[in-house]
Amino acid sequence: MNDKNIKIDREFDLGYQAYQNKKYKEVIKHFSKVIKLDNNNSAAYNNRGLAKENLQQYEEAIEDYDKAIELDNDYSNAYYNRGNAKYNLQRYEEAIKDYDKAIELDNNNSIVYNNRGNAKYDLERYEEAIEDYDKAIELDSNYSVAYNNRGLAKWNLQQYKEAIKDYDKAIELDNNYSDAYYNRGNSKYDLERYEEAIEDFNKAIELDNSSDAYNNRGLAKYDLQRYEEAIEDYNKAIELDNNYSMAYYNRGLAKKNLQRYKEAIKDFNKSIELEPNDILGYNQIGFIKTKQANIELKKLNYDKALGLLNEAIEYYDKGIKIKSDNSEIYDSRGYTRTKIANFERDKNNIDNAIKLYKECIEDFNKAIELNNEHALAYNSLGYIKNILANIQKDKISEEDYNQLKKEALDNFNKAYELLMKI
């Protein structure tokens, strides 16, 4: 063996040792020396690429994998590694092509099938992802990660019971697999098995103190109407991640249910600040303003109530301007407008009331257009058309009056029909 080969072998050994110790910058130095000594060494390019990938230098890693493949176009690991780098850059279709090639060259590598499944999963091609996870498990029946990933794909297809079986297997193979406990908790939550879900979230938190597990445990407690406990979990989620917009939103919901409206509004405003394009917070603040208006109406504080109702409308308008395809916010705005219309009717401002009721109808029709099973919107339409018939009885023809009454009854019947399905 000549001096050059001895030096190459030494740099390879040092590079492997550095890689094992996760000293990736040193890895790059060692394999760069190999490449300087032998620029046709495909393994050196591949290994340097791996180090760069671990440093999240994905584009540079791809350049090294390209070179490795150029030197050896049957280098299955280089295709696989390049696929991983492209996956991390969210170039999923390109990643799949590399995984395809890696599998063509070596179809016995369970990890490649798993990772190709991950790319298909992220493209929402869940059925295809499951096929890849199936193959990964066929090749390695103890592959806990593949069971977990297959469970996630089934969960996205709303196959919750099947997903749980996969999570069970993942946990059987690795009883410290925090993600599998967390994911199983989510499936049990979706099956409304809230107490069981909490047990899984407890285990996930014990193993990995994650903000998501606290947030989702809070959701389960919320649905059990244990609002104070839910708030404690949301507090912890926010402590771990103070930019967790959904945790603020969920905490706001719990506080709203405890009638702690000012605190709830503060949380909803924070969720809006963090996610300005998410309209859920706008809808909830509008709803709270409407609830507060109802309280003021009972106290006969009409001006204050009207002010709150108009503030609510402003929030709904902001939300709709951001996202115009959400049925709930149209329904909410219609409900609040109905309150204002009733206010005008009770003051005998009939023309104003009629104009407002017609705006309400537009909102409820839009809510139904976006969700044709929106029972509350149908019920509200019936309520308004019945009012319009009554307050206009002396101004419209008998035919128009009867038509409004008929439409009102049809809307009530439709609402009842939909509610009976629940």
Regions found by a protein language model. Name each.
Residues N39, N73, N107, S141, ...:
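Short coil turns that delineate tetratricopeptide repeat
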Residues M1-E11:
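TPR-adjacent "capping" and linker segments in tetratricopeptide-repeat scaffold/adaptor proteins
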Residues F12-Q20, A43-N54, N77-N88, I111-D122, ...:
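Conserved alpha-helical positions within TPR/SEL1-like repeat arrays
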Residues V34, A68, A102, A136, ...:
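Canonical positions in the second alpha-helix
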Residues N386, D400-I422:
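TPR/TPR-like (Sel1-like) alpha-helical repeat modules
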